[in-house]
Amino acid sequence: HFYGYGELRTGQPVIVDIFPRDGRTRYNGDCTRTVVHGDIPDEVKRMHAAVRAAKAAAESVIKVGATGEAVHRATVQAMLDAGYGWGLPKADSPLSYCAITHGTGHGIGIDVHEPPLLDLKGPPLLAGEALTVEPGLYRRDLGGVRIEDMVIVTQNGFENLNRLGDGLSWK
């Protein structure tokens, strides 16, 4: 995780990633939200809408037997459909280059990051697996937007363990 640097500015997206560990069971949680103090720039609103759509696309694939690869490809396609890129920026990319630069999610349990991964090599999903679904978009001159929930894989889909809203408002 990157902790950032410098002062926070009004209108800047702030990614808040929390991953508490239960003191008794030693199992981890993981949740990310993005918030903005003050007026939200139009491009941040557009990025946020694309991340929400990508998360919904990923979740529509999750069920027993679906692969982590299929989940990730659904995420990437939603980002591409929204006009964003895929992959790290090249050295000569403009500061406005905006893309998904990581996998869609990961298993979670005793470790915060564990298999299965929701990426291009992601295996078939099993009933009862705990996963995160966390698409994000990142832009060097503006910042990033990510939404992350924990889910449990079920026979016909998933159960979302998070109840926190995913809006951008700081208030």
Language-model regions, residue ranges each:
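Active-site neighborhoods and metal-handling regions in enzymes and metal-associated proteins
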Residues: 1-171
